[in-house]
Regions:
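Alpha-helical transmembrane segments of multi-pass membrane proteins predominantly involved
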Residues: 1-480
Length: 480
């Protein structure tokens, strides 16, 4: 085997990321705590260099590497650029928060970069083993990140719960993959699809394997009834880690699901679509109703995530138009969640952890700008125009209607109206309740600037949604 046969160029962003990650990891060993900002700067530089590398090797169409186990296409390129941007922003947001809690350490950055590498492999996988390796690299990094605050019993408990349930989901995924291999004789997505299309596969075994794989995907997305870990992780993990867990990995999981279900098992769409419909309906009901009862804003955002994943699963029911709407929704959700968690991190000081809804009381009187940014995020999540969240939900609902799923569309609208209640409750607390304290808000200018850009993208791309929708549609052109 020649190295040239591997065609490494499409995978150059991941290769550069791995190399620079090693540099950050080794350099951090020699950096003392008072100079830890150097690790922070090196990590930011790593993300920038990897993003530039991705743009430098950008090619039109689809290109594979590693003998067809890795693919660089429009969807993977767009997803990776969004992942890089989210990681960069979250590094900026989290710095003052981590410093106040003695977790401003190299482990946070190296584990985040390992997770980013895992996500990059996931979204570029063209083979079940590649997808599994990327997923496990992401999962193992997140387990450690959640337990990063060693003096917190809640963090340790959340990490242990996530680890146990994550190991179970990984086992189910492997079991499903083994059945797919037994049914088709291949683990390559294209070969599995061709085998099923040509009726050369063991249909019963393939469908049974598909059931296990859908369960594993539902766990990674946090869909009901496999959502048990989501509120515990969001609540127990440091807010900086919860922000990471709740944003970038969701985009990777959506693309991961697309790769497996559409490019690998598209011929049995009629079998997995009803399963996704049940998961979506359950997620919308449980997510929205449970969120209404929460007083802890991190747990509220966790159940909100569950309901948003329900919308994304509905998008898989609606064919090519639905896939575009689903990818757009995933990007929108990640941007909205990044703003929400970013504001919570900025409001959290050394003495106060902003984690209850009442902690936001009177925020408009204490810092009107952060109150406005939180308002943009909450309104967008509620689906109020002209913000991105409205067009994300509108796109999914219209895609469902075009496919004749009228009742699912009506149900989604009803759930959106119910969900708007708890988002508007947060806005009411921010603007109309009296503050419980006069604790000054942090004034990290870098975090404030990036957070402002993040929030205004929700408004800008809400006013001009077609820009991002076209990106998503073009990204999927050579993938479908």
């Amino acid at each position: 085997m020649n190295w040239s046969d591997l065609n490494l160029m499409p995978a150059m962003p991941e290769i550069v990321l791995l190399a620079l990650l090693g540099v950050v990891l080794l350099a951090d060993l020699w950096i003392c705590d008072k100079n830890r900002y150097l690790t922070h700067l090196m990590s930011l530089g790593t993300v920038i260099i990897v993003a530039v590398t991705q743009l430098a090797v950008w090619e039109q169409g689809s290109v594979d590497a590693f003998h067809g186990m890795y693919i660089a296409d429009g969807m993977s390129r767009l997803a990776k650029l969004v992942l890089y941007a989210l990681t960069f922003g979250l590094f900026i947001y989290s710095k003052p928060y981590n410093q106040d809690r003695q977790i401003f350490k190299g482990e946070f950055y190296t584990l985040s970069l390992f997770a980013l590498l895992g996500m990059s492999v996931m979204v570029s996988s063209a083979h079940f083993l590649t997808a599994y390796i990327g997923l496990e690299l992401l999962s193992l990094s997140l387990y450690a990140m959640i337990a990063l605050r060693r003096d917190s019993g809640r963090s340790a408990e959340a990490a242990l719960k996530y680890f146990v349930l994550g190991a179970l989901a990984s086992g189910l995924l492997l079991y499903g993959i083994s059945m797919v291999y037994g049914a088709t004789g291949s683990l390559d997505f294209a070969s599995v699809l061709a085998s099923a299309f040509n009726e050369q596969a063991n249909e019963w075994l393939l469908k049974l394997g598909m059931v296990f794989i859908v369960v594993a995907i539902a766990f990674k997305l946090g869909a009901v009834p496999f959502h048990m870990w989501v509120p515990d992780v969001y609540d127990g993990a440091p807010t900086s880690v919860a922000a990471f867990v709740g944003t970038a990995p969701k985009i990777a999981a959506v693309v991961f699901a697309f790769r497996i279900l559409v490019t690998g098992m598209g011929t049995i769409h009629s079998d997995w679509a009803p399963m996704l419909a049940i998961l979506a309906v359950a997620s919308l009901v449980v997510g929205n109703l449970a969120a209404i009862m929460q007083t802890n804003i991190k747990r509220m955002l966790a159940y909100s995530t569950v309901s948003h994943m329900g919308f994304i699963l509905l998008a898989f029911m609606a064919g090519a138009v639905g896939f575009t709407a689903g990818l757009y929704y995933a990007i929108t959700y990640a941007l909205m969640a990044a703003v929400s968690f970013g504001v919570l991190m900025v409001l959290s000081t050394r003495d106060i952890e902003c984690e209850n809804i009442k902690d936001l009381a009177g925020l408009n009187q204490r810092h009107a700008w952060f109150a406005f940014l939180m308002l943009l995020s909450m309104f967008s999540m509620a689906g109020i125009p002209p913000l991105m969240g409205f067009y994300a939900k509108f796109g999914v609902i219209m895609a469902l209607l075009k496919q004749g799923h009228v009742w699912l569309s009506v149900f989604a609208v009803i759930m959106s109206l119910i969900g708007a209640f708890y988002y508007l409750r947060v806005v009411k607390v921010i603007y109309f309740d009296a503050p419980d304290h006069d604790q000054p808000v942090g004034s990290n200018y870098a975090a404030k600037f990036v957070l402002t850009v993040n929030a205004f993208l929700l408004l800008l791309w809400g006013i001009m949604p077609q820009t991002v929708i076209d990106w998503c549609a073009k990204a999927l052109e050579n993938t479908l």
